[in-house]
Amino acid sequence: MEPNTVIPKYNVRGFEIWGFRDMAQVLDHLLGSGPVKTGTLVAMNAEKLLKAEDDTALCELIKNAEYLYADGISMVRAIRRKYPQAELSRVAGADLWEALMQRAGQQGTPVFLVGGKPDVLAETEAKLRAQWNVNLVGSQDGYFTPEQREALFARIAASGAAIVTVAMGSPKQEIFMRDCRKFYPDALYMGVGGTYDVFTSHVKRAPKIWQNMGLEWLYRLLAQPSRIRRQLKLLKFVGYYYSGRL
């Protein structure tokens, strides 16, 4: 990334979305030549935006995060409609996580993993070490009690992790990251949902051609028809789009 490059932010329904040009720009901004940036990364798509509008607590969590990025093609198109000169690309959360892990492996950046089933987490750790020699300084599956949270925060702090990725689903992962950051602010936190499952092939992701066409949502719907109710809720976002209320 060129020195002094200013990355624009775009307001969509009150949420400030970073306008990253491409994956390389994201990586250079977060893991450039200096220390890893600290803060919280939150993937934004139409579904999460609508959920946040109906949930005051989640809305506050998201708006307090430092890095909101356009994870869904719906968000990219909304920004381009509202800001015709915007030059940004979709940054899929699963792809960003893998790119961060690869760069972390190259730079020896310490990483702590949270969430997922025990077997999936173990497979994720093994694959990260084998594939990119990632410096994993600790992990915790998603099966811990509320009483164990502070001890986990202490473990993360003691590990010296510079990147903490949390796979617990929304809004649990946003709540966890907020609370852990109060205890240990010296890391980059990223909520990754079901990314560990995809990375270890327990869940199949849409083929690249579907992703490139912006139809990953349709692929998931065809594979899991029970998602239809969730998809129908997105009609509200379509209304925002065509009525100029973005």
From Swiss-Prot:
Q: Does the keyword Flavoprotein apply?
A: no
Give the keywords, sorted.
Glycosyltransferase, Transferase
Reaction catalysed by this chain? UDP-N-acetyl-alpha-D-mannosaminouronate + N-acetyl-alpha-D-glucosaminyl-di-trans,octa-cis-undecaprenyl diphosphate = beta-D-ManNAcA-(1->4)-alpha-D-GlcNAc-di-trans,octa-cis-undecaprenyl diphosphate + UDP + H(+)
Record's InterPro entries?
A: UDP-ManNAcA_Trfase_WecG, WecG_TagA_CpsF
Q: What is its EC number?
A: 2.4.1.180
What superkingdom heads the lineage?
Bacteria
Q: What class of enzyme is it?
A: transferase
- UniProt pathway: Bacterial outer membrane biogenesis; enterobacterial common antigen biosynthesis
- Annotated Gene Ontology MF terms? hexosyltransferase activity; lipopolysaccharide N-acetylmannosaminouronosyltransferase activity
Q: Does the keyword Transferase apply?
A: yes
Might you name a Gene Ontology BP term for this protein? enterobacterial common antigen biosynthetic process
Q: Which family does it belong to?
A: Belongs to the glycosyltransferase 26 family.
Q: Which NCBIfam families match?
A: PRK03692.1, wecG_tagA_cpsF
Alphabetized PANTHER family for the sequence: PTHR34136, UDP-N-ACETYL-D-MANNOSAMINURONIC ACID TRANSFERASE
What does this gene product do? Catalyzes the synthesis of Und-PP-GlcNAc-ManNAcA (Lipid II), the second lipid-linked intermediate involved in enterobacterial common antigen (ECA) synthesis.
Q: What is the name listed in the Swiss-Prot or TrEMBL entry for this protein?
A: UDP-N-acetyl-D-mannosaminuronic acid transferase
Phylogenetic lineage: Bacteria, Pseudomonadati, Pseudomonadota, Gammaproteobacteria, Enterobacterales
Task: Give the gene name.
Answer: wecG
